[in-house]
Amino acid sequence: MRRINRLFQIVWVICRYRLDEFAPLTLLPLPLRLLFLLAPWRLFPKPQIPRGERLRRALEELGPIFVKFGQILSTRKDLLPEDLADELKRLQDKVPPFASDMAVRIIEESLKSPVSELFADFQTYPMASASIAQVHAATLKNGKEVVVKVIRPGIEKTIRLDIALMLLVARLVENYWEDGKRLHPVEVVKDYEHTIIDELDLQREAANTSQLKRNFAGSELIYIPEVYWEMTHSRVLVMERIYGVPIADVEQLRKANVNMKLLAERGVEIFFTQVFRDSFFHADMHPGNIFVDVSNPANPRYIAIDCGIVGTLTPEDQSYLARNLLAFFRRDYRQVAVLHISSGWVPGHTRVNEFEAAIRTVCEPIFERPLKDISFGQFLMRLFQTARRFDMEVQPQLVLLQKTLLNIEGLGRQLYPDLDLWSTAQPFLENWMKQRIAPPGLLKAIKQHAPDWIEQTPELPQILYEAFDQLRHLDRYNQANQDSLASLSRAFEKDKQQRRDFWLAGLVLASAAAMAIGDQPLRLTELPWPSVMLAVAGLYLLMRPK
């Protein structure tokens, strides 16, 4: 019942803000187009406010999942009209706050102390309010300035309802759309469910923040604020307050004489460092979570907050991704095609030459061009068409990475439109690959694994024995399977034979009856002998042992 109520709530918001205006009717099949034209929202008058504001307000009312979708879109001025993208930027830190007295109560219940004892000063009005939590400024007893992040009450229930509806839609897509299974929508939604539910646990966010801070300790690329663990709970997070210019405020960055080219290049370097050096990356890098330290404009440094969503890669995915990107940067499209096939991302029967030609057609137009001259919308459309043509399957484990890459590319486009993304990224990847296969890299890998190998050495005989034992069981299992298959095959052949006999017997008996029927009724002894012979043959076919 709650799902139905939530569905009605979503439809009501769509109706009230007339979001049907944003539906691409010309791209929908005729039945869906008719459904849209007859839907109840057309009975509502269009509000007398700009369409961008209508979209933003609707996303805010619908909740965090929809807000996060809007945050991703806000960086895509190449995909959205400028008025929509500019309005959606307000989603990043202008979501309406919840009551301050409720925030105080959550803090005191979680940390088991009154706010007056925890802080020398606590600002009851929030300094920022987002879809999942809001942030209050405070000062510790020792004089350090901090921010206090508090989870919105009741937000988990709303998120779980939205996820349930998304799963329902995903199952419908997977079962009834021809491309559904290739896109793995159910698996993608389930992965997203784990991600966003984890974001509701502020202790997990604190752990992610601490890990990122260690990874970039002493770095001039990015600064991560300090977490105060003694004042952290699953619903409350206290961390160092930072000061910087929001990354989206390009005008202010230029006024501060920030080296915009260096800033954009460092954004790319930070992304690839997280993915390939650390295999641990901040996966919610929309403009509301990124600031710039402009104290040294010639050497600007990023500041990242809100580390609730992070991504990781397996060594296998990391290796395949790096090799694919390097081949792509070198325009070695055949290698890209071969890697996609060998990794199972496209079916093994795919013709390499055809796939190589398709990749070249999509990718060649975007090389040696700055971001401002690349239509990312057209690039994505061509990429999706190629994926569909060659049955390329979506890799759910890489969806978070792709979302992050979209954010980074969008930020780079805003900061320094002349940035050549490919030439900036290629040297970093080449250096990373060289380090992996060079003697120091191999020695480091051996050192990392050596303790595990040594620890398992005494167990090696038992491991070998169990492996051979499993092989013996596997042989018996295979033999049993072969026997079962042989039995099924015999049963199938027997069934086919019976069907043939029934059809033949019916035909023979019908022929016998036709020959026996004449103008005069016959006694049994007067039946023609051919008819009798056919009848006997038909009865034999019906009654013979099977």
Curated annotation (Swiss-Prot):
GO molecular-function terms, A-Z: ATP binding; protein kinase activity
Record: residues binding ATP = M127, A128, S129, A130, S131, I132, A133, Q134, V135, K149
Topology relative to the lipid bilayer, per the entry, is: Multi-pass membrane protein
The entry's cellular-component GO terms read: plasma membrane
Q: Which UniProt keywords apply?
A: ATP-binding, Cell inner membrane, Cell membrane, Kinase, Membrane, Nucleotide-binding, Transferase, Transmembrane, Transmembrane helix, Ubiquinone biosynthesis
Which NCBIfam families does the record match to this protein? PRK04750.1, UbiB
Can you say what this protein is called? Probable protein kinase UbiB
Q: Which organism is it from?
A: Hahella chejuensis (strain KCTC 2396)
